[in-house]
């Protein structure tokens, strides 16, 4: 019996965390300085649960382990314990200087705000999802009370 016969779309959410520092190039407030966050990322996907009785994924939209692998490979492994800087001529010299001492400096082609990081993360995750599964939403916390 398929209990999902009338429930066509289900959403799944998994939470991830990583530590990273960034600086907002040219910003007119305190966040222009290098500072860090304990990021919490909530990834929600949607799809229809597999219905085939012989299907090993019967009743699942997606294996949580697969979602974990995708997000860890695309996001967490790159950004955890990193310094994220916008790719600019000024930051290129800063990056070169810092790279002599520190290893995980990530340069991006956007201002590394919470909002822009979400756009980047959405592209990275979406292209890896299995057929029939879509990215529904992302929520990225920079602090316990601030998120996009």
Regions from the language model: what does each represent?
Residues 2-148:
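Charge-rich, low-complexity N-terminal segments
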